[in-house]
Amino acid sequence: MLINSGTSRSLVLSGNIHDLFFIRQEEDTDYIPLVPFLTRSWDIPGFILIVYELNGPIRFAQDADREKVKQAFNVWRGTTEPEFDPNASTSKRRSIGLLDAAAEPADVPFTQYMNDAIGSPTLALELLRQFCLLSRSTNAQGEKLLSEKLIIFIEAADMLLPEGEIRSLSLQDRHRISIVQDWISDSNFMNDNDTVIFITESASLVNSRIIRLPQVVTVEIPSPGMPERQHFISWLNNTPKLVEKPLNLWGTQTQLAMLTAGLSIQALRQLLLSARYSGDKLQPEDVINKVSEFIQGQLGEDVVEFKKPAHSLKDIVGNQKLVDFLKTQLIPRITSTGPDAIAGMSVCGPIGSGKTFIFEGLAGELDIPVLVLKNIRSMWFGQTDVIFERLRRLLMALVKVLIFVDEADTQFGDVGRDAHSTERRLTGKIQAMMSDPQLRGNITWLLMTARIYNLSPDLRREGRVGDMVVPVLDPSGEDREAFLRWTLAKVIGGPISEEAVEQFLKLTADYSAASFASLRSDLEAASLHKGRLSTTSDETGELTLDEIIAVVEDRILPDIGPIRRYQTLQALVNCTRKSLLPGDYSPEIRESWVKQIARLETIGVTG
């Protein structure tokens, strides 16, 4: 539509450019790479298709089209084709330079330019620009030298026209950028019928002097969706090679197509051909492993990780009110695909309160993939945008996934004027993706942080992760007693008296969930040590109450109390559910929390 309507004569194809695409020609069907797919699909009367690859020659889709252009070019330049000597010096031929009619000899023929362009991308781009000038030219009688329209495909545009400040680019890079800028900014080109199509995985890698021109339109090729994957599975299973040995699946082709969400057609092909060759039944675990391997390969193991937590909500100690809330209120909204689906949530609370363990348990309770986002920023210039674009294509293809981001305040930056441009751009794109209606019901964001106040207000707004801000606080009341009994369970035999419980509760008055876990480890170590020192078979290594008290009294908690108090108050202030707050809630109580935060900030405590 863009080409036929004349909306743009300069297109950038980005995204899933390395995949296979379905084509039907008469009775034959096949899956082929992008450029062959485009040249076959658009090989119709009235068009001349030209392809330029960085490491190859300028190619014409049809030999007859090459001859047409050659004849028109030589007429236009007033030249004839001499006998071509392939052994002639290439450097001598290239000494002529680029195609500037004012400076070039008029008798340089088409074939010589085509050969000189091999391995010389600057000359190749200028020659392609000249073809467009030729297409608009007429002879002495006013007849067009070329009646067909040109469609020019330029592969690896990011290598030909790399992003970067002009002053930091090489002279050749700057020359190519200048050629292309002049080419596609020419009003005669924009108003004519020729089209140039740049192909790159990420538009952000193409120089901004080109990509930001208003006449340049970027078209993203998405990852294959459910219908495309299902079609490929059916097509492959019906190809002659597989008719005698069909795929051996654990379930239906539809189930396989659903489980392979996130895979490209190339990766899906590898999976199916490998399964066919082995003859083993393809199991869901095999598919999940392939999806995980593919996604980590695309984004990098330091960027994402597929996770299946070993524990679930039944393994959570204490936090009974929160666990009940997760089961009754949150899980139904995460698993929903309807209007009640939640876009995301924030989990906050002081360090050591058990946020990660609890919500990993939530992830383990859900029967959906959990994608852990580790570090989306890259140290390499331009790669952060590429990683994000790959991530977005992946998420658009997935059917249902939970994105788990721990230490979210360090992952996402600010969008203010003081932030780095890459950080602002990345955070802005993540925010837009969180509120994208296309992803709602398919993607749920789970952001964990002890410093909720460091998250951008734009992230925390409703419609993103501000719909639900869940505080995880230190255990109190029955929850503290549950933690205490869990801590002592392995080192003390029999029931614990109420008096002992009260004594231990006093000794552990300021303990967090992490403190109880650390104490449990210390007690188990003391128990093992006692067992090793035992000289009688009757000694089991169990600790007496006095021995337990000795271990507890020997411990000194880290000096982080004021910081944890500040983080607790911030979690209370930012919580979006009264039912998750301790005790009764009132505006007066909230105001007291705000005042306590201000007092801590005046003495330099900011978490």
List where the protein language model places each region.
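N-terminal nucleic-acid engagement/recognition segments and initiation subdomains in replication
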Residues: 1, 6, 607
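Walker A/P-loop NTP-binding motif of AAA+ ATPase domains
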Residues: 1-3, 11, 25-240, 311-505
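N-terminal targeting peptides and non-cytosolic leader segments immediately upstream
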Residues: 7, 17-23
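Charge-rich, solvent-exposed alpha-helical interaction surfaces
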Residues: 37, 72, 127-130, 179, ...
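Surface-exposed polar/charged interaction patches
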Residues: 40-44, 79, 131-138, 239, ...
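Conserved ASCE P-loop NTPase core motifs with emphasis on AAA+ ATPases
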Residues: 204-205, 210-212, 280-313
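Conserved AAA+ ATPase small/helical "lid" subdomain
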Residues: 229, 234-292, 493-556
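C-terminal engagement/docking regions of AAA+ P-loop ATPases
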Residues: 297-361, 365, 393, 397-398, ...
